[in-house]
Amino acid sequence: MNIMLKGFTKLLLLLLLVFTSFSLQAKPVDWRTTTFDNKEHFLKYMSACILDVNKKLPREQKVSDELVVATAVLESAWGTSRFALEGNNLYGIKTWTRTGPNMLPLENEKANFSVRVFLTKCDSVKEYVRILNNHPAHKDFRTKRLETKNALYLAPFLQNYSELGDEYTKRLVSVILYIRKHYDI
């Protein structure tokens, strides 16, 4: 009887382990429908996305997770901006052609540009990294990136991404330091 009880107990534990492992497995990220409940959720999403983007790139084209995330925080207000919510555009990436999906800025509907719409938020991350790797305005960034991956050192070389210049660098550094202090990414 005691042996039977031990066998039954082992079977129950095995079944419990199997069923709980199914329910505890991470759900795959649905890149298309993601909205963010809080800053931590935003950071986890961004970390998963940039990991996916960087693993497909040669070493010299990879971009620091912290820079990609901090820029998205600044440009999309933690993923809550209209462009992020309606257009999956975390970086305010503009277009001057109206051939593809795009959005007009509400405050300037007569602008000669529009903001790109992406299928997924992660697609906007891919495009941001592509811009950093190819646009002439970011040549200095690419040169310095070969020397270090330190986000705080590289942040000043992204000042051309915004019309704010040096002020943008200060904000970017501030966001990087805030994330380092409050979150583990």
Predicted regions and their residues:
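Bacterial N-terminal signal peptides that target proteins for export
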Residues: 2-12
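Catalytic cores of secreted/periplasmic lytic hydrolases that degrade extracellular macromolecules
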Residues: 22-70, 74-185
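Bacterial N-terminal signal peptides
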Residues: 12-20
